[in-house]
Every structure is written in C-alpha cells, then in structure tokens.
Curated annotation (Swiss-Prot):
Produces ATP from ADP in the presence of a proton gradient across the membrane. The alpha chain is a regulatory subunit. This is ATP synthase subunit alpha. The keyword Cell membrane applies. The gene is atpA. Gene3D superfamilies: 2.40.30.20, ATP synthase alpha/beta chain, C-terminal domain, P-loop containing nucleotide triphosphate hydrolases. SUPFAM superfamilies: C-terminal domain of alpha and beta subunits of F1 ATP synthase (SSF47917), N-terminal domain of alpha and beta subunits of F1 ATP synthase (SSF50615), P-loop containing nucleoside triphosphate hydrolases (SSF52540). Belongs to the ATPase alpha/beta chains family. F-type ATPases have 2 components, CF(1) - the catalytic core - and CF(0) - the membrane proton channel. CF(1) has five subunits: alpha(3), beta(3), gamma(1), delta(1), epsilon(1). CF(0) has three main subunits: a(1), b(2) and c(9-12). The alpha and beta chains form an alternating ring which encloses part of the gamma chain. CF(1) is attached to CF(0) by a central stalk formed by the gamma and epsilon chains, while a peripheral stalk is formed by the delta and b chains. It comes from Phocaeicola vulgatus (strain ATCC 8482 / DSM 1447 / JCM 5826 / CCUG 4940 / NBRC 14291 / NCTC 11154) (Bacteroides vulgatus). It is found in: Cell inner membrane.
Length: 530
C-alpha cells in the first residue's frame, strides 16, 4: 500500500489545500451588555460606535445607538427586552439605521425596519437603501407649492386647500374624525392612479391597536387603494423605539418616490404618540427632561421630520446636486417630485395651546382643526372653519374652485357670528336672515359621509349652487336630497361639458348657465312639496 503513494502527489494535494485557506482575518468590533431594562441596553466596549448605528445581539435582535457616553453606549432595542441578558455579546453592523425601499413595497404592511407584517412573503423587486434620518432638502432644491392635492372633501378643497409638498396638520380630540380625513384623502388618489399619474401614499400607524390597523388596511384594500399605498405599522404592543422610528421610516419611503420624480403623500397617525414614545426612551436613557417631562429636543424631533416634506425644483441638473442624497439613489434622481405630509395630533379637551400641539402648529403650513361639538351635532367632517387655515395651499387651488369658493370661508365664519347674535334678537332684517339661511344650507352641503370622496368637478358645481343662492327655495332639511339629485343629473347629462371642464380649472358663462338651469330644474319638486 505504501509503495503506491508518490511523494509528488502528496505535496500537490497539500499545496492545493494550502491555497484554499483564507488568510484574511475578519474583525468584528464587539461589546457586552452591562445592563438592560425597559427597552434600553447599556453596552460596554463599542468605542467606535456611531449615533443611529444598528447593533446586532448574538441572538439576532437589533438595536439602535442613541446615547454615546464616555465608557458605554446606550442603545434602544427593536425587539423584546426579556430576550436580552447581561453579558450578551453585541457587534457593530457599521450601518446607520435605514430601510430598503422599492416598488415591491406597494400594497404591503411593514414595520419601521421594512420587515413585512402581512404574511405575504418577502418584498420583491429592486430595493434602494434609504436612511431613516436624513437632512431635509435645502432651499435651493425646492420650489413653491403650486399644484393641488385634492382630498375629495368639499370643506378642505374649498376652504383649506392643500398643495403638493405642503405640511398640513390635522388636529383635534380623540374620536373627532382625524384619521377619516387622512383615509379619505388616500382613497381620493385612486383617480390619479387610474389616470397614470399616481400619488403614492404612505400611512404610518404609531401606537395604535393592531385590530385598528388591520381594519384600516382592510378598508383600503376593499376600495382598491392598497395598489398605491404602503402601511408602516408600529402598534401599541411594539417597543417604544419602534414607535419613535416609525414616522422616520414613512418619511424615508416618501423620499424615495419624491427623489425619483414622483408625488407622494405621507400620513403620520399620530405624532402625539411618537412624542410620548420618545419621552419614554429619553427618560430611560437618563436624558434631562423639560416641560411636561419631554426632552429638550422634542421640537427638533418634529421639525426635522416634517421639513423633509417638499416640492422639489423642476431643473434636473440642480435636483441631482441635492444635499444628503443616499448613495443608492445616485443616477436615479429625477426633478419635480413632491412629498406632502399630513401629521395628526390628538388634543386633550380641545386644548390647542398645550406643548406638542403648539410645537407642531408652528412647524406646519396650516392646520385643520376638528371639534367634538360639531362632530356630535352631525357636521362631519367636523372642521372648525374659523381657526383652520392653509398658509400655502391657496396658490395651488385650481382657478375654477378659487372663483366659486373664494369667499366661502369668510361667509361661513360670518354666518357663525350672525347665528350667535340671532339667538338674542327677536326680529332680523332681511339681509341678515338671508345670510343665516345661506350659511345653514352651505353647512348642509359641506357635510360628507365617511369614505366617499367627491371629484373636484362635482364639488365646484354643488358649491356654486350654495354660494350663488340657488338653494333659496329648497327647505333646509331637503338640501342633502337636492345635492344627490343635482349631482346625478350632472353626471348623467353634463359630465364632459361641465364637470370635466370645471375639473380642468375652467369656469365660464356657458358652464354657469348650465349649472343654474340644472339647479333650477332640480329645486322645482322640492319647492312644490314644501
């Protein structure tokens, strides 16, 4: 047997094996858990860790660095605290917290790290890595808001118009219809999607019940809105860190669409819960607290998030130089995109002068204020027109709507005052009586059921009837019936020559003559029956 072994063959085999040995050493910077409690771990040994860097524990759970101290690192856990023990090994990933974004995300429900929650498998297609934290575009890369974002709600589109690239706050007590306004806005983008000009929607659920999120996703799916929508969910059962990072994940996804030249809408529902989650994390990290025990940088938290909403300049060569562009987007940047933000804030007993509400009001470009009393009286959406405002949306409103509804906001505010005075007065002059009657009827016109957004052409047609006193012969309790009959007749006989023309921003004598004739014909039976 030994005679058959040739030394040359042995040396050849040994040489082959030696060639296959990898002599490169892989160094991982690791540390150990000193202490863990309430979703925060203190780690010793990671001297070169960076702020917002992802860390990985030996059991696969991830954390994000938030505190950099002399002898240890404070990291917030993105998984269950009970699975982390003292002494566990932690390694740096050398990656700043980010999310992988792509077209395959549309129609999916994910967590703030991009992990699917809907049981429909991994997210497919090409993905770009987008950092959760990123500087907002500089002034030179922006352009003024000049294009409308139609919500499908008459009250909003007529009196508090929203433009693409705007930040419009939705504020009110619990159970006043804040989420409904945001969901109706998402549903109203279906016509844009079908026309091949989609506004991609991102709904961020922060600290809500899992059942509420599931019901909402079901509503969007039933109405065909999930085709252009992504839901980011950090429910009440998730760690505070995930609830804190959820809005940043939504902003990062929106920026992917914005920077590739498309329009996106992100809804943060709601930032009050994010502020509470951030307060919880900050207090556990022993950061100094300020007013209402919130940390000192709570204003900066919301301002740096909401400043990321913008309308990007139309010049391609300028857009390509945008500050803080992620490497994954190089070569894919297109000019003219937009990211619109609808942050939601919950107030306590209508107190808009509290700390977080005043912060966000001062950051945003306007607010839609919802009132419990109006909601309980059946005026839905329950918008208080007097203190709701849109600071930049007016320049984005289409001309036909501006012409028809230009004075509606002031008229309705004056009607409220006149009605309050009329309670103390027994006799009224005819002008005041007429103004109050018109105000009441306009109020009825502005009532809109949930999940039934209206095309802008129909909105303008029916509001023309209200603002031009075409309802004077219709009894107050019949206004809703008049609206239904009027719009049915307009859709059947005047879709192209009136409604489509109004939608394009044009209003002329021919169009108004048709509206007045149809309104007179529709009002006739209501007048007779009275």
């Amino acid at each position: 047997m030994s005679e058959n072994i040739k030394p040359s063959e042995v040396s050849e085999v040994l040489l082959q094996q030696l060639k296959g040995i990898d002599t490169h050493l892989q160094f991982d910077e690791v540390g150990n858990v000193l202490q863990v409690s309430d979703g925060v771990a203190r780690i010793y040994g990671l001297r070169n860790a960076e702020a917002n860097e992802l860390l990985e524990f030996e059991n696969g759970i991830m954390a994000i660095v938030m505190n950099l101290e002399e002898d240890n690192v404070g990291a917030v856990l993105l998984g269950p605290t009970d699975q982390i023990k003292e002494g566990m090994v932690v390694k740096r990933t050398k990656r700043i917290a980010s999310i992988n974004v792509g077209e395959g995300m549309l129609g999916r429900v994910i967590d703030p790290l991009g992990v699917p929650l809907d049981g429909r498998g991994q997210i497919g297609g090409e993905l770009c890595e987008m950092p959760l934290e990123r500087k907002a575009p500089g002034v030179i890369f922006r352009q003024p808001v000049n294009q409308p974002l139609q919500t499908g709600l008459k009250s909003v589109d007529a009196m508090i118009p929203i433009g693409r690239g705007q930040r419009e706050l939705i504020i009110g007590d619990r159970q006043t219809g804040k989420t409904s306004i945001a969901i109706d806005t998402i549903l109203n983008q279906k016509s844009n999607y079908e026309a091949g000009k989609p506004v991609y929607c991102i709904y961020v659920a922060i600290g809500q019940k899992g059942s509420t999120v599931a019901s909402l996703v079901n509503t969007l799916r039933e109405r065909g809105a999930m085709d252009y929508t992504i839901v980011v969910a950090a429910t009440a059962a998730d760690p505070a860190a995930l609830q804190y990072f959820a809005p940043f994940a939504g902003a990062a996804i929106g920026e992917y669409f914005r920077d590739t030249g498309r329009d996106a809408l992100v809804v943060y529902d709601d930032l009050s819960k994010q502020a509470v989650a951030y307060r919880e994390v900050s207090l556990i990290l022993r950061r100094p607290s300020g007013r209402e025990a919130y940390p000192g940088d709570i204003f900066y938290l919301h301002s740096r998030l909401l400043e990321r909403a913008a309308k990007i300049i139309n010049q391609q060569e300028v857009a390509e130089q945008m500050n803080d562009l992620p490497p994954s987007l190089k070569g894919k940047v297109k000019a003219g995109g937009s990211l619109t933000a609808l942050p939601i804030i919950e107030t306590q007993a209508g107190d808009v002068s509290a700390y977080i509400p005043t912060n966000v009001i001062s950051i945003t470009d306007g607010q839609i204020f919802l009132e419990t009393d109006l909601f309980n009286q059946g005026f839905r959406p329950a918008i208080n027109v007097g203190i709701s405002v849109s600071r930049v949306g007016g320049s984005a409103q289409i001309k036909s709507m501006k012409k028809v509804a230009g004075t509606l906001k002031i008229d309705q505010a004056q009607y409220r005052e006149l009605e309050a005075f009329s309670k103390f007065s027994s006799d009224m002059d005819p002008v005041t009586a007429m103004a109050i009657d018109r105000g009441r009827k306009n109020n009825q016109l502005l009532i809109q059921p949930q999940y039934s957004p209206m095309p802008v052409g129909e909105q303008i047609a029916i509001l023309y009837c209200g603002t031009h006193s075409l309802l004077r012969d219709v009894p107050l309790h019949k206004v809703q019936d008049f609206q239904k009959s009027f719009l049915e007749m307009m859709r059947a006989d005047h879709q192209k020559d009136v409604l489509d023309v109004l939608s394009s921003g044009v209003i002329n004598d021919d169009v108004t003559a048709i509206i007045e004739k149809v309104a007179a014909d529709t009002a006739q039976p209501f007048k007779v029956n009275e």
